[in-house]
């Protein structure tokens, strides 16, 4: 299997014969993700990795995750995604203000996927009290500070404009960023940006311009 392009390319990165590996255009993501975990490995302190898209719009810069890797994340996976997003946003010299999204607001639905998101938020707030993160919440409350502050004045995000959106699963993340892309083709999207692997392995799709 070493002659398969993903294994060969990633082994070159792992052994120092290449600085980075770009993949995904002609291979299945599921296979590429498996090889990346096996050959490159995940950064210490994490059990999962993910990807982020950056949206540069007239309204500002937004960071969206996870847009490619984790199909049905559980609470532990969402925690890792949130931690990786925080780290990545800071790398780009922004202060993360994180909303963890759902169709439910702050425990209103006590079943299904909102419970996973709520659990991730509770953990993050307990372990990282200095971090501006809250949820679970609907995207309209995440994006509208005045509406959010009026309806939910108790949030840790009071008075803050959200710039980082963590989606509850891959379906919502993929649909969300591609909907924004389709509605305004002039808006600049950067990504997917890999978060959490030990070395630079980057994924592309058919819409990639570079």
Predicted regions and their residues:
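Anion-binding alpha/beta catalytic cores of soluble intermediary-metabolism enzymes, centered on
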Residues: 1-210
